[in-house]
């Protein structure tokens, strides 16, 4: 479970520390600040064979706020805020709680909402058309080989994650809108009554 959460995850910093492609990505994220959208997901194996399809809602807001609600085929929920990440499986009636730091170490996806110069410098960023590939530099451990984020003008439109086994998760976004004050409750996870709690945070 923890590995799948790490694969799913991925700032705005002083421009002086970035190469040109990274500067441009940071600028687009700076303009965006926060986004809420519906998504459709397709997961394919290394041979391009479709493994799974899904849909749900995603929201991101800087700094360090992330919401991912898979509604089909099976419901699951991930909420990240500040230093903690909550992973809720309604079918299993279980909540796992992780340190945000563990997610940041393992996935470039977290860069989209995190302000950490050290983390940004661990990744190579290359523009390819309207997309930006985020790749761990040599020696950086990551469950994800590449995260590609694509924009239509200044609106985030697609996220593609490729893992070490060659599997690809493609999230196509629709009905994008700015995060408003009314959406802030998305990032405040309330643990349901009666569920099992697996708190893996370092105290």
UniProtKB/Swiss-Prot annotation:
Keywords: Chaperone, Periplasm, Protein transport, Signal, Transport. GO terms for cellular component: outer membrane-bounded periplasmic space. The keyword Glycosyltransferase does not apply. The gene is lolA. The lineage of its organism: Bacteria, Pseudomonadati, Pseudomonadota, Gammaproteobacteria, Alteromonadales. HAMAP family: LolA (MF_00240). Pfam families: LolA. It comes from the Bacteria. Participates in the translocation of lipoproteins from the inner membrane to the outer membrane. Only forms a complex with a lipoprotein if the residue after the N-terminal Cys is not an aspartate (The Asp acts as a targeting signal to indicate that the lipoprotein should stay in the inner membrane). It is found in: Periplasm. Residues 1-19 form the signal peptide. Its main location: periplasm. Monomer. This is Outer-membrane lipoprotein carrier protein. GO terms for biological process: lipoprotein localization to outer membrane; lipoprotein transport. Gene3D superfamilies: Lipoprotein localisation LolA/LolB/LppX (2.50.20.10). The keyword Cell wall biogenesis/degradation does not apply. Belongs to the LolA family.
């Amino acid at each position: 479970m923890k590995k799948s959460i790490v694969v799913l995850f991925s700032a705005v910093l002083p421009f002086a520390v970035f190469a040109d492609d990274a500067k441009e990505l940071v600028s687009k994220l700076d303009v965006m600040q926060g986004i809420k959208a519906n998504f459709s997901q397709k997961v394919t194996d290394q041979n391009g064979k479709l493994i799974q399809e899904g849909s749900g809602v995603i929201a991101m807001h800087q700094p360090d706020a992330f919401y991912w609600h898979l509604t089909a085929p099976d419901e699951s929920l991930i909420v990240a805020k500040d230093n903690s990440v909550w992973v809720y499986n309604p079918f299993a009636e279980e909540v796992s709680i992780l340190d945000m730091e563990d997610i940041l170490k393992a996935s470039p996806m977290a860069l989209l909402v995190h302000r950490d110069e050290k983390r940004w410098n661990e990744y190579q960023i290359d523009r390819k058309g309207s997309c930006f590939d985020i790749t761990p530099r040599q020696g950086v451990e990551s469950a994800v080989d590449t995260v590609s984020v694509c924009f239509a003008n200044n609106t985030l439109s697609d996220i593609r994650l490729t893992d070490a086994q060659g599997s690809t998760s493609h999230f196509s976004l629709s009905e994008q809108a700015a995060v408003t004050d009314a959406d802030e409750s998305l990032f405040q996870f309330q643990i349901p009554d009666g569920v099992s709690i697996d708190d893996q945070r370092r105290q």
